[in-house]
Amino acid sequence: MSIPNILIAEDDAVLREVYVKKFSISGFSIRAVTNGQEAIEEIEKQKPDIAILDLNMPVMDGFAVLERYPRASRNFPIIILSNFGDTKNKERGITLGADDFFIKSEMTIKTLLEKVTTLMKAKQMWQK
């Protein structure tokens, strides 16, 4: 089996580096970008196994990426991360097709890793 490929779109350099290190140590191949436009460019080059998108980024936000890749037309899960615990944002993200939505201040890297692992297992089962 190939190494799972994760796309991380996060404009905060410190957080982006933390995610890259933790996921790399856990055996994932990582592509990291700083905004939604770069995320779309990377998705067009090579579809990720999972995309993790910050909600609020310059140039293009996570919602715009979700709108570009609705759940019915993509074969990879998308997780949205946000600094804000606004229920409306979470509802909009899920409505647009996010597979999960985490508030950064309420989440740990371990929780995010567990969610990614769960989504990868589900994806592999569907592909069999």
PLM region spans:
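Conserved acidic carboxylate
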Residues: 10
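Two-component/phosphorelay signaling modules centered on CheY-like receiver
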Residues: 13-31
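Conserved Asp/Asn-Gly motif in the active-site loop of CheY-like receiver
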Residues: 33-37
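Active-site beta3 strand of CheY-like receiver
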Residues: 46-52
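Active-site residues of response regulator receiver
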Residues: 54, 82
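Receiver (REC) domain active-site loop signature in two-component systems and cognate sites
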Residues: 57
